[in-house]
Amino acid sequence: MEILYTEITQDLTEGLLEISLEELEKNRKVYYIVPSSMSFEKEKEILERLAKGSDSAVFDLLVTRFKQLPYYFDKREKATTKTELGTAGLSMLFRRVLRSFSKEEIPLYFSLQDSAGFLEMLIQLRTELLTANLSVENLPDSPKNQELKKILSRFEEKLANDYANYSEFGDFTSRLADGEFDFQLKDVTIVIDGYTRFSAEEELFIESIQDRVARFVIGTYSDENSLTAGSETIYISTSQMIGRFRSKFPVELRKMAFSSVNEVYNKLTKLLDLDSRFAISDQNIEINSADAKYFRIWEAENQKVEIEGVAKEIRQKISQGAFFKDFTVLVGDPAAYEITLKEIFELYEIPFFYAQEESMSQHPLVIFFESLLSIKKNNYGTDDVVNLLKSKVYTDVNLDEEVIDYFEYYVQKYKISGRKKFTEAFNESEFSKIELVNQLRENLLGNDSPLQVFLGTNRQKTGKKWVSDLQVLLENGNVMANMNTYFSEAESENKHQMADKHEQVWQMLISILNEFLAVFSDEKLKSVEFLDILLAGLKNAKYRQIPANVDVVNIKDYELVEPKTNKYIYAIGLSQTNFPRIKKNSTLLSDEERLEINQTTDENQFIEQLNVVNYQKNQFTVLSLVNSAKETLVLSMPQIMANEQGEFSPVFQLFLNHSDEKILQKIQEVNLFESLEHIGNSRSVISMIGKIERELVETEEKNDDKRVFWSSIFRILVKSNPDFQKILLDLAKDIDTVNLSQETLDQIYGDKLYASVSSFERFYNCEYQYFLETTLGLETFENIDINSKIVGNFFHEVFEKVMQEEALSAENFDEKLTKVLHDVDSNYSRYFTHDATARFTWTNLEEIVRQTATVLKETVSTDELKTLLTESSFGLPKSELGNFSVDDIYLRGRIDRLDQLSSDYLGAIDYKSSAHSFKLQDAYDGLSLQFMTYLDVIKEAFPNQKIWGALYLQFKNQPINLSEINHLSEIAGLLKESMRYDGLVLEEAADQIKAIENITVKKSNIYNQEEFEQLLKLNENHYQHAGQRLKSGQIAINPIMKRSEGIDQTGNVRGCRYCPLKSICRFEANVHMNDHSREIGQKSQAEILAELKGEGRNE
């Protein structure tokens, strides 16, 4: 055995390749072994280096891994019909084994038999024991480990008897030791590169083969001091490994020396070495300004700015002749950076390969199985059924996607949930697409549908039967046909990566089903158990990753770094929390148990002590990282990471303490002093134009020369890029609307406008809202809560029927109310049983009704105010109050109550489920049209009677704070005080109205006859103005905005506060407020009244 070592600043691979070439010249076969985590990249690197020489040399050199070696020497075919279980199959077998135990046998772990996390930990423990050359008998004695021994022993027994799983590598090592391959090995050279430590399994293999081959070489990193310094060294793992080998067999140990060393990386390495040994150097180590060419530390504003900094530098170096493959980006948190990094690199047109394993969990086929399981577990929840159909894997023949949208709309609108409701015909006949939706329901969810045939039973079946039934579902539900279609379409569109994903997922399903049959074929399971087992394998599966192109930027986790990785290295996202990365032991064996095992086992048997190993790994990872670049290394940290303030890691602090100030660079989002070569590409400049312009404005006095530079860049972009020209032209009118044509106006409106009063209040809130909701009839889903329309209708119907009861009096009021509640409840019950929110609302309705009814009871008992009509309509067929129009606008609506004073004055009562009061400002701005319209209708319907006004009555269940009262007897009075009418009253009826109990009239809402007529005229003017706008085809996006309120905490102006249509109009308050809003609330009440008495209002 030869062990060659060199310092990590040197190129170890170069020296090992020289040895490999020497061996190839001797006609020996060279097996070049590298760690599994970097085998692909290492193989590419080695072949590229060897390509400079003779082509024949490559043929006899194989870059491989330890576990692949049996394949090259053992050519025997496996004569077995047994199934070999993969990770998913092993998890299934562990699940089956756990189900075979009683609670008394494994009390600690019995409840975890279906826990995916626990199953994964069992697989991990078994793998660790195999790698450590240990068995379950080596586990320390404790109640927990006694249970683990039972589980693992029964598992190994089942595995050995029924399956083809065995350790090929372990078997190969045993046969090596028996001399079975001596003849094949006599002309073989084995070279091992990149290891500083080996597992027990690997060390046993090395012991068995090292004296049977022509030459056995291990190349590693160390120095003379580390081989004698014990634990005080940065190469501690290497020194321990060399020490073990030298104690077992003869080792030729020698140092490989090279001449060229980049001094800055040598400095960084020395700093780490001194820090690890807590030593102080006699010689001052300083990273000076000249070293900034090779090494820098970035402090970026945030992740986005950090990634853009990398992208700009890559584009700069590409313009100078570099290749994309010369760059490697190392990431501190691959998952957190993935989306942003991909978006920015695509913006800068940088090809890349992101070495982050992608889960199959988002593939439509996996979503289909996930929805199947959720449907069965949650009894056909609305969202689960919709997700199943939206996966577009389970479909009817020629199913139109639009029909799925209709189906989703229907089930969401009518709160369809539960198996019974989905298997029975939908019966809301007013839904225009009811036939299409019912056809889809019948074909895909009906009693005879493939889904129901598969899920319809709750009885247990054997695993074999479940797989057979699933195959029927996949065929009859067109799942197989759809998967083939997806694959073919992706291939035909040259989307080969997507086609490969479709194929991988399908092959994974087949593999899991085969392993399921091998494990659970004769076991009886329920459908939920079957789907849960199946889904566990699918959701944990990963896609194979193969770079699509050679000339790409490689992006990967910084822990996968090795020395001399590439020319240019950018290590980003390195903060105190992840550099170095602190890992906790989350396995089934504690660090103390691992230490106990290692103290009691034989030679070539040891398990990793994670607390020790992780420390050594972190140390070597940092060492590898600072020596990973051949030309330039950048270490970077964002100031804000995951919405938290980032802090420099101890490694950064160490380097900065010995660095010139030029080594640390602040990376900003906009840097006006960047030159032409730093700005990336035209697309990135276009994306930054707004921020650059803002920066120029804020620093106008200091940056006149930079304004000239950037203005020149913008002019060039405008001239050379027609798309950019279009963007600039559209910026000022990105939400401008287009006037409707006369032909369209004739179709949607005709000669006369028919609309409700409330719709015109929406018009004055925002014209575009009126257009979408009233003209186009766009509806939003309504959840049934205390403010929903259904609840409002419920209240109105209850009080309408109560007030219409014959011989109604204060004495029989409660009795008649109870009867009406019972009748109305039966009519509305279907609306209030759809979901939990609706059921909760229903439980509160009676309390609200009864508390509000106390006011009505008072009204019934007084002679001063009597109800003439309830729910009296106008503008509808057979309306009690006839038609009502303003010019050619025909209005419709209902007045909840028409009440008459003892003096014969008439007025209106309007019920509301939320707080309302009459505000002159809202009437002036067109936001409150109801009261004045109702009074105008009454005036027209009863021309010989005078008007007293209009009042609101809110339905509510007023809470009382008991800590604020002295006696319980006060509650009734407080409740009564909270339930009051409020509105506007005419002056001549004010005294009579105020004398009635439960009515509050503010002085500001008492108007004389002249003011009343002016308000009616103002109201009519609002309708006339709206009608003119509508008939002209002018529809503006102009939500109301009160200057004193501005933009609220949700980012909205007042008109958008409760609007669900912003995704359509795309109004953004901070961008469009000044040009696309209508300002209200600018005048006082005195100013409004004065204006009404004058020339009127200018619209």
UniProtKB/Swiss-Prot annotation:
Belongs to the helicase family. AddB/RexB type 2 subfamily. Gene3D superfamilies: 3.90.320.10, P-loop containing nucleotide triphosphate hydrolases. Keywords: 4Fe-4S, ATP-binding, DNA damage, DNA repair, DNA-binding, Exonuclease, Helicase, Hydrolase, Iron, Iron-sulfur, Metal-binding, Nuclease, Nucleotide-binding. The heterodimer acts as both an ATP-dependent DNA helicase and an ATP-dependent, dual-direction single-stranded exonuclease. Recognizes the chi site generating a DNA molecule suitable for the initiation of homologous recombination. This subunit has 5' -> 3' nuclease activity but not helicase activity. It comes from the Bacteria. GO terms for molecular function: 4 iron, 4 sulfur cluster binding; 5'-3' exonuclease activity; ATP binding; double-stranded DNA binding; helicase activity; hydrolase activity, acting on acid anhydrides; metal ion binding. One of its GO terms (biological process) is double-strand break repair via homologous recombination. It comes from Lactococcus lactis subsp. lactis (strain IL1403). NCBIfam families: rexB_recomb. Its cofactor is Mg(2+); [4Fe-4S] cluster. Binds 1 [4Fe-4S] cluster. HAMAP family: AddB_type2. The keyword Metal-binding applies. Its EC number is 3.1.-.-. [4Fe-4S] cluster binds at residues 766, 1056, 1059, 1065. InterPro entries: ADDB_N (IPR049035), DNA_helicase_suRexB (IPR014141), P-loop_NTPase (IPR027417), PDDEXK-like_dom_sf (IPR011604), PDDEXK_AddAB-type (IPR038726), Restrct_endonuc-II-like (IPR011335). This is ATP-dependent helicase/deoxyribonuclease subunit B. Heterodimer of AddA and RexB. Despite having helicase-like domains, this subunit does not have helicase activity. Transmembrane segments: none annotated. SUPFAM superfamilies: P-loop containing nucleoside triphosphate hydrolases (SSF52540), Restriction endonuclease-like (SSF52980).
